[in-house]
């Protein structure tokens, strides 16, 4: 595949029409591999000897955030410099010149920023329920399976199986296994078609890695943040709550909060992160398993604005729906409040409405202050609590995206983001969701063990 990718890069320099296979904006492993494998197959089988160029729909600088992608590319010996990223090709200019044909893989909806490219879309291959209102008017192939790589495998094996080499087979095989959580029937992500094509790949290439080995390796790489900067760790799995000009980032971090807080120059990095991205506050949710294989969750609220920080902390501490069961943890910075979260069943998805509530309470207080730039500076905790009472009995519904962000495209089911708003099919398993499922399994096993010992 390396020679093919070099040909793709050379084709970018030619003044000729291009066929581009574009993955989704999350660029998770499924999206990346599906784009690579499908473009490679289409190039090999093109009667007109056209070249189909796989484009990873992120900036090159963002690839390190996707540890499983980086690991797998190294594992199958595909050099990163050979890949083509979204910031290295001007799709709009190509389209305006009449030189672009676009194939969407692992998504079927273009974001508002790419709306002009819809006319260039010639085909869609996706594994989520179709949204007719937004889907491009072209050939659309959609089937509810656990991994889009399964549909790419099917296309290859039904069309021209002789074109499939071991390197591409390894990419598809590992991706399906990761997406389908090692084909675990208890989790229920894998469909019969996913299982069928994993078995067919293993039959064609018996030396492919054992399922458990490749799943464990990819899963470990996916959660590994050891080589990331603080900003990369915060951006790796992040959502944003936005309300009337106030923005709060919520980042999932897969390590012990104690270790995170001991990072060199952490508070400088947190301040820079909030300043550079115009966040008024940052909520870090740390998630990991302890030595007894029990799930542990912790919270850290970083905010230089005292009134906003007190409001967020007050709402979280007082929350009963859901109850977080927070225990304060000492902090070395006055701008950061840390907690141990006793209720490990409260995921980020469940926390988002509580944070929306906190923003509403803060903005209500700001209105009462009538024009003060910093609300209630010097206000006592008891006074803040009185204001919080007005909002503490109800949760504010709404999206957890910036108001400027388009609600589309839906994020992939296996990406690092929590949920796809259009997906009503197979269960969604993000990194956060996989952790939550594993937590439930771990707790269930512990309960059974206690029962059997009685």
UniProtKB/Swiss-Prot annotation:
The modification N-acetylmethionine is found at residue 1. Mn(2+) 1 binds at residues 28, 106. Keywords: Acetylation, Cell junction, Cytoplasm, Hydrolase, Manganese, Metal-binding, Nucleus, Phosphoprotein. One of its GO terms (biological process) is regulation of neurogenesis. The modification Phosphothreonine is found at residue 411. One of its GO terms (molecular function) is phosphatase activity. It comes from the Eukaryota. Homooligomer. Able to homodimerize via its C-terminal domain. Interacts with NME1. Interacts with GSK3; at focal adhesion complexes where paxillin and vinculin are colocalized. Interacts with alpha and beta tubulin. This is Exopolyphosphatase PRUNE1. It comes from Mus musculus (Mouse). The gene is Prune1.
């Amino acid at each position: 595949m390396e020679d093919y990718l070099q040909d793709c890069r050379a084709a970018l320099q030619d003044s000729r029409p291009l066929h581009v296979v574009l993955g989704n904006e999350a660029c998770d492993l499924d999206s990346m591999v599906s784009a690579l494998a499908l473009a490679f197959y289409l190039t090999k089988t093109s009667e007109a000897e056209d070249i189909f160029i796989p484009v990873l729909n992120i900036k090159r600088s963002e690839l390190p955030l996707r540890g499983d992608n980086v690991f797998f590319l190294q594992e199958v010996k595909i050099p990163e410099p050979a890949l083509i990223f979204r910031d290295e090709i001007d799709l709009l200019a190509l389209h305006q010149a009449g030189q672009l044909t676009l194939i969407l893989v692992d998504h079927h909806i273009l974001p508002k920023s790419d709306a002009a490219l819809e006319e260039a879309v010639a085909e869609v291959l996706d594994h989520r329920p179709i949204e007719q209102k937004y889907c491009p008017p072209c050939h659309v192939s959609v089937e509810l399976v656990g991994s889009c790589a399964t549909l790419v495998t099917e296309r290859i094996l039904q069309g021209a199986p002789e074109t499939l080499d071991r390197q591409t087979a390894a990419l598809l095989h590992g991706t399906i296994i990761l997406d389908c959580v090692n084909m675990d029937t208890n989790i229920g992500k894998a469909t019969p078609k996913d299982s069928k094509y994993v078995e067919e790949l293993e039959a064609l290439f018996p030396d492919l890695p054992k399922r458990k080995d490749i799943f464990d390796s990819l899963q470990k790489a996916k959660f590994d943040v050891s080589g990331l900067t603080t900003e990369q760790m915060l951006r790796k799995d992040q959502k944003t709550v936005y309300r009337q000009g106030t923005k709060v980032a919520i980042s999932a971090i897969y390590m012990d909060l104690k270790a995170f807080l001991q990072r060199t120059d952490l508070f400088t990095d947190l301040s820079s992160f909030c300043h550079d991205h115009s966040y008024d506050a940052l909520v870090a949710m740390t998630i990991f398993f302890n030595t007894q294989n029990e799930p542990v969750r912790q919270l850290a609220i970083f905010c230089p604005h005292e009134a906003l920080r007190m409001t967020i902390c007050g709402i979280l501490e007082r929350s009963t729906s859901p109850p977080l069961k927070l225990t304060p943890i000492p902090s070395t910075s006055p701008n950061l409040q840390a907690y141990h979260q006793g209720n490990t069943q409260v995921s980020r998805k469940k926390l988002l409405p509580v944070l929306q509530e906190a923003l509403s309470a803060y903005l209500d207080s700001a209105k009462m202050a009538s024009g003060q730039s910093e609300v209630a500076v010097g206000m006592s905790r008891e006074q803040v609590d009185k204001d919080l009472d007005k909002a503490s009995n109800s949760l504010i519904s709404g999206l957890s995206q910036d108001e400027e962000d388009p609600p589309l495209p839906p994020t992939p089911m296996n990406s690092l983001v929590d949920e796809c708003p259009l997906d009503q099919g197979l269960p969604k398993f993000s990194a956060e969701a996989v952790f939550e499922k594993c937590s439930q399994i771990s707790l269930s096993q512990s309960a059974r063990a206690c029962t059997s010992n009685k």
